[in-house]
Amino acid sequence: MARKTPIERYRNIGISAHIDAGKTTTTERILFYTGVTHKLGEVHDGAATTDWMEQEQERGITITSAAVTCFWKGMDMSYPEHRFNIIDTPGHVDFTIEVERSMRVLDGACMVYCAVGGVQPQSETVWRQANKYKVPRLAFVNKMDRTGANFFKVVDQIKTRLKGNPVPVVVPIGAEDNFKGVVDLLKMKAIIWDEASQGMKFEYTDIPAEVKETAEKWRENMVEAAAEASEELMNKYLDEGTLSEEDIKAGLRARTLAVEIQPMLCGTAFKNKGVQRMLDAVIDYLPSPVDIPDVEGTDPDDEEKKLARKADDGEKFSALAFKLMTDPFVGQLTFVRVYSGVLSKGDTVFNSVKGKKERIGRIVQMMANERIEVDEIRAGDIAACVGLKDVTTGETLSDVDNPIILERMVFPEPVIAQAVEPKSKADQEKMGIALSRLASEDPSFRVRTDEESGQTIIAGMGELHLEIIVDRMKREFNVEANVGKPQVAYRETVRKTVTDVDGKFVRQSGGKGQYGHVVFTLEPQEAGKGFEFVDEIKGGVVPREYIPAVQKGVEEALTSGVLAGYPVVDVKVRLTFGSYHDVDSSEQAFKMAAIFGFKEAARKANPVILEPMMAVEVETPEDYAGTVMGDLSSRRGMVQGMDDMVGGGKAIKAEVPLSEMFGYATQLRSMTQGRATYTMEFKHYAEAPRNVAEAIVAARAK
């Protein structure tokens, strides 16, 4: 079966933004104009096509990235047909993992900003993630019809807050109630959309006199940005004083793909203006799978050996599983992005991370919550596979005879935990199945059993994250559960180096005994460096075969620190000396010696408690700014700055310990009469002050 759309005409894009910037509405309009949906789905009435989980429709926020395929020929039908695979990403900070996951498999992104709210906290997080994966992007300023809308202020904020380099390719005609359309700076014509046709029809007209000067100024800015793409274009611009439409597009495209600039557009998705021009910009400026560097990976048999795969049907098959979903009708769906080669239903592929073969049952392409079965998918495609038994998010599927491991995604450690128990005994087993299924879908969500209390503990990225998990258990698996109070995920570490600490495990009372003896040096590592074990044994004083058991013992000891039993992080253990007994030594004896030795060393090395610090940003009317700052300080918060917001009001940034933030939403509402909002995301671990640490230790001792 031949390819229907040439790969050069593919665009794999994500639409990402802060909550309420109108991202889902923007995606809806895209699906409407590209002919997928016939009645526009509004988030206002809980009917948007991409928000297909029940909780999303209730809460009006997008949680899971739905992947949708659609086609576009340009708003005036002047382009050959292009195929868009659109991933709608969530805008709530508790779901950062979803954004990170989609950034990994996208080729380009459309960042949606609110013309009133401007650049908000989540916009910064998403921008950082897009930088990390070097994703070329466009910016779309939405809600131009709202009171307080200001396009140029958002342009400034992208420069100052995000350190971006925005280049408007349209400018608005009017704003607020007066927003009529945009000036296309390439054609130097006004575009006015016809409201009766829901924006399906439009006309080019002359630029209104009141925006002529603004349009000329910004056109000059755009042409200069395009000219900087190459010496040839710069010389042409200097000689002729301008550039042709083709040259401008080519220059802007080259610089967008190099992540040097971000073409910027505006409109109002809700009123059906501007999204159509943004779709043309996706074709003009965002990359196809062949415009990005070949995907790189390693050989499963030799981590040092680097491999690459071209975005080509003729290459050996490789794909990344970037999302798992449980579907009520077909069971487990595994979303994959194909980087090279062809995958047909019935094929056997190799999970190169786990070293297992998998058979592809069926392949479906998603039109939001409608699915179309296909026989095969090719390089550049995004689709869902049915029938994979043991594939987790972030794993690579490849050709059986030519395996490759693509760059793994790194998922953050959870910062908040809660005990959860089923309301009835009958639900006990169902709860276990539900939680393990949810954990395989979402790597930032963990499940474990507390050894002392026997309780099931769930951990995640924030209160909302865990709330939604419990909610999904109820809806999708019919498991009713009681949830305990949220617990902070503290950690322990050490602050000083101790040398020559003995760890001994000796049991010798007739018959075969036990003998293990190790000597450690324990030292702190810089934050975030993790655990390191160094074997410095000389002359076989601890035999080779026992060294892995020593490391295993240390790793086991790390799970429970000496102060309050929290996991120990950021330490280096050097095994420097030891002794053994010809008959009585065993792996078990050395493992026990290592556990005792590590605990002893940790007690002497000035152990401390670490607590998770959160980056908190509060947006509040100016009158309440003082109260909000005072309250953050009383929560042991460090206020780091205050910015003016586009539509008035203040954005206050602070770093606050997570333990002080429980119940903050209610407190903030009452302090500001419900007029302030806040977002919070994990920043790093920091040493807890002595009085706080003592209280934590005392609470654990009870």
From Swiss-Prot:
Q: Which domain of life is it from?
A: Bacteria
Which is a Pfam family this sequence falls into?
A: EFG_IV
Q: Where does GTP bind?
A: 17-24, 88-92, 142-145
> A GO CC term?
cytoplasm
The answer on whether this UniProt entry bears the keyword Protein biosynthesis reads yes
Alphabetized, the UniProt keywords read: Cytoplasm, Elongation factor, GTP-binding, Nucleotide-binding, Protein biosynthesis
Q: What biological-process terms (Gene Ontology) are attached?
A: ribosome disassembly
One GO MF term, please?
guanosine tetraphosphate binding
The reply on keyword tRNA-binding is no
Xref: HAMAP family: EF_G_EF_2_B
* Described function: Catalyzes the GTP-dependent ribosomal translocation step during translation elongation. During this step, the ribosome changes from the pre-translocational (PRE) to the post-translocational (POST) state as the newly formed A-site-bound peptidyl-tRNA and P-site-bound deacylated tRNA move to the P and E sites, respectively. Catalyzes the coordinated movement of the two tRNA molecules, the mRNA and conformational changes in the ribosome.
* Family, similarity comment: Belongs to the TRAFAC class translation factor GTPase superfamily. Classic translation factor GTPase family. EF-G/EF-2 subfamily.
Query: Which protein, by its recorded name, is this?
Result: Elongation factor G
Organism listed in the record: Acidovorax sp. (strain JS42)
